[in-house]
Amino acid sequence: MSFFHANQREALNQSLAELQGRINVSFEFFPPRTSDMEETLWSSIDRLSSLKPKFVSVTYGANSGERDRTHSIIKTIKERTGLEAAPHLTCIDASREQLREIAQDYWESGIRHIVALRGDLPQEGGKPDMYAADLVSLLKEVGDFDISVAAYPEVHPEAKSAQADLINLKHKIDAGANRAITQFFFDVESYLRFRDRCVATGIDVEIVPGILPVSNFKQLQKFATMTNVRVPNWMTTMFDGLDNDPETRKMVGASIAMDMVKILSREGVKDFHFYTLNRAELSYAICHTLGVRPDVAR
């Protein structure tokens, strides 16, 4: 390592030390499908809750069974941990009346934060009746929810252009959304350029970077293709030869994410959203690097 790069790393670590106690984190979970997965979920929630995250979110599936599990998990998180629990809510395959009922139920249950999404289109295609901006407007009619929406630094796969995608995000913010959480990414520059473009477009809410600590690189490559996320060549090289070495994969994945959050924090980012995949270890370790710890957390 050159003297210059050593100094850069030292400066990054020093800037992180100065931010201790001023970083906000949040975590995403998904509804488990088996009893073993449920045990892992609650173990992860219990461990990560000690970091006093700003909120935790739970994804929302297309089928009614998974939707019911989301409702149940959200209410249990609130009762069990006292954390702000934010359910994902999608408007695909649901009428306005159904969405209004769901939102009203959440409001009456004390849930005040919702992640509002359009959701995946059905396989048969067709134009949706509602978009995320419409859902944000509907939620604001029900109650003064704190609303998070999705943003795409590398452009949504269905968007006609980067500019059209940005205009769509602005519609969601103008409808009343309080923040945007990005799709995961690995090119930090793509996030920073996107943040600048948001400001230039008049989007004045926090653009929270979504961080995915990678433990299964092959699975990531498949998912990245579907979501239009670029996986840099250097990252492929770092995971090369680790197909049968899950422990080393975790260490590499954590190292990559730690470097990302260090650079982002230097660029003024103080809020991070972690896609945990229902596992605590990597997110917990990265938060420790950020200075978010049980004894110093907000």
Curated annotation (Swiss-Prot):
GO terms for cellular component: cytosol. It is an enzyme of class 1 (oxidoreductase). Keywords: Amino-acid biosynthesis, FAD, Flavoprotein, Methionine biosynthesis, NAD, Oxidoreductase. GO terms for molecular function: FAD binding; methylenetetrahydrofolate reductase (NADH) activity. Pathway: One-carbon metabolism; tetrahydrofolate interconversion; Amino-acid biosynthesis; L-methionine biosynthesis via de novo pathway. SUPFAM superfamilies: FAD-linked oxidoreductase (SSF51730). (6S)-5-methyl-5,6,7,8-tetrahydrofolate binds at D120, Q183, Q219, R279. One of its GO terms (biological process) is tetrahydrofolate interconversion. The keyword Cell inner membrane does not apply. It catalyses: (6S)-5-methyl-5,6,7,8-tetrahydrofolate + NAD(+) = (6R)-5,10-methylene-5,6,7,8-tetrahydrofolate + NADH + H(+). The keyword Coiled coil does not apply. NADH binds at T59, Q183. Pfam families: MTHFR (PF02219). The active site is at E28. Catalyzes the NADH-dependent reduction of 5,10-methylenetetrahydrofolate to 5-methyltetrahydrofolate. Is required to provide the methyl group necessary for methionine synthetase to convert homocysteine to methionine; the methyl group is given by 5-methyltetrahydrofolate. Belongs to the methylenetetrahydrofolate reductase family. This is 5,10-methylenetetrahydrofolate reductase. It comes from Pectobacterium carotovorum subsp. carotovorum (Erwinia carotovora subsp. carotovora).
